[in-house]
Amino acid sequence: MVDISRELQVAISTGKVVMGFKEVKKTILTSTPKLVILAANAPKWAKEDVEYYAKLAGVPVFIFPGSSIELGAAAKRPHKIMALAVIDPGQSEILKLVEHA
């Protein structure tokens, strides 16, 4: 099983990750990220919006099994993160989340 927190930190430090609802939505519309991660407590409207555009773009969506506070902590950020998009996973194996989901 993939350690989500560790792989997320590796992806942030060695790859390219975009954080925040607006930035993730913009990334899905303008380019194709490899993976979108949503916090489990994301508002319904935000979750539906991101999932809709991700489905149109063929991007897998992973629901992080924790709150936006926990997702922020997993990313080693001092704030909440509702959504993030992995554009380049770098040396991480975060894309294996899709295989296990």
Swiss-Prot record:
InterPro entries: Ribosomal_eL30, Ribosomal_eL30-like, Ribosomal_eL30-like_sf, Ribosomal_eL30_CS, Ribosomal_eL8/eL30/eS12/Gad45. One of its GO terms (molecular function) is structural constituent of ribosome. One of its GO terms (cellular component) is cytosolic large ribosomal subunit. Keywords: Ribonucleoprotein, Ribosomal protein. It comes from the Archaea. The keyword Ribonucleoprotein applies. It holds the Pfam family Ribosomal_L7Ae. One of its GO terms (biological process) is translation. PANTHER family: RIBOSOMAL PROTEIN L30 (PTHR11449). Belongs to the eukaryotic ribosomal protein eL30 family. This is Large ribosomal subunit protein eL30. The gene is rpl30e.
